[in-house]
């Protein structure tokens, strides 16, 4: 589609659960001239009554100038070695702030990032879900009614449209997916429906919007998965820097944040995975007991904004470093367990956290 940066999307239907599929994409001016092929593979989710082990990986903070390999980003090489069932990018996939001042330049950011060898090789072999945050929507801490001259000709509406052009998506940018008997994940939208960060906090201030919040609570309560995981572009638990006012762990959104943490705490075997923060952590909310895993940024060069000696009561693990998070849900002596492992960019395990289903 020339109006969508020459991207093409099509829906696959009738796929069987728990099945490995091979894909061949053919492209070129014609079959006789410039014809090329690209092969890939992916696995579909197991059926809801299948207790098959599932592993997925997560990252955030993928800024092009901070890549750590001539071929792109090292984490994609290491994640591929784990042969994950699926991958989630929680947002900050790329950064419009400095160089994406027009829609054409924003599209160019997608083109150059997803032409990197490590990303092409990884995504040819792993099913992926993409979420957006502020930097691939417009700029740092963006909201729909933000007025800014900083981004030139680029607008919030442009960011929403370009994101949907560049990544595969269903009917909404918030959705839930069941991966077998023991896992269901919720991927939420944190930019489209939010109030201005500068608005006074209270019952009317929101990040998710009323419709998404109602959907989230309803679908979580309907789920009988052994483990339920909220995957959020931004923190729900934190802790975060005191001057931040963009997420549910900040005082600026304390009302909705408290309601969300209270709801999650009322659910058995539910945890949070988040992106956005430039450091890895495992934290437990001191009021409600909600557990949160921050994936940390894609590279060591991107890590920062906190220090390893600033350990708070919430922290079970803290490391200002790049890498990724891998989550496995499997059975141990017939009982469901969740294992969350933080990795460095070199593929070394930095921390392991294990939870048995209650």
Summary of predicted features, one role per range:
Residues 1-358:
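Metal-dependent phosphoester/phosphodiester hydrolase catalytic core
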């Amino acid at each position: 589609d020339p109006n969508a940066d020459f991207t093409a999307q099509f829906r696959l239907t009738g796929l069987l659960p728990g099945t490995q599929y091979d894909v061949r994409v053919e492209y070129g001016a014609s079959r006789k001239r410039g014809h090329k092929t690209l092969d890939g593979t992916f696995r579909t989710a197991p059926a809801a009554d299948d207790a098959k082990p599932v592993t997925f990986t997560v990252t955030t903070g993928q800024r092009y100038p901070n890549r750590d390999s001539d071929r792109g980003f090292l984490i994609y090489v290491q994640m591929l070695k784990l042969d994950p069932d699926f991958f989630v990018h929680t947002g900050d996939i790329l950064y419009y702030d400095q160089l994406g001042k027009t829609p054409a330049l924003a599209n160019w950011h997608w083109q150059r990032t997803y032409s990197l060898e490590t990303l092409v090789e990884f995504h040819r072999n792993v099913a992926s879900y993409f979420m957006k945050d502020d930097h691939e929507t417009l700029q740092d801490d963006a909201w729909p009614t933000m007025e800014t001259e900083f981004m030139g000709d680029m607008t919030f509406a442009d960011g929403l449209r370009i994101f949907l052009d560049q990544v595969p998506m269903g009917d909404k940018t918030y959705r839930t997916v069941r991966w077998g008997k023991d896992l269901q994940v919720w991927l939420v939208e944190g930019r489209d429906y939010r109030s201005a960060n500068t608005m006074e906090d209270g019952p009317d201030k929101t990040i998710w919007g009323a419709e998404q919040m109602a959907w989230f609570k309803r679908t979580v309560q309907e789920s009988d998965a052994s483990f339920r995981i909220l995957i959020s572009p931004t923190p729900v638990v934190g802790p975060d820097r005191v001057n931040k006012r963009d997420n549910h762990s900040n005082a600026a959104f304390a009302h909705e944040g408290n309601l969300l943490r209270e709801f999650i705490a009322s659910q058995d075997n539910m945890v949070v995975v988040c992106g956005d923060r430039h450091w890895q952590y495992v934290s437990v909310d001191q009021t409600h007991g909600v557990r949160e895993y921050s994936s940390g940024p894609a590279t060591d060069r991107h890590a920062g904004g906190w220090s390893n000696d600033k350990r708070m009561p919430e922290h079970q693990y803290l490391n200002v470093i790049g890498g990724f998070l891998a989550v496995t849900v499997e059975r141990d002596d017939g009982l469901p367990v969740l294992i969350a492992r933080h990795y460095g960019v070199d593929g070394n395990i930095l921390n392991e956290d294990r939870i048995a289903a209650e």
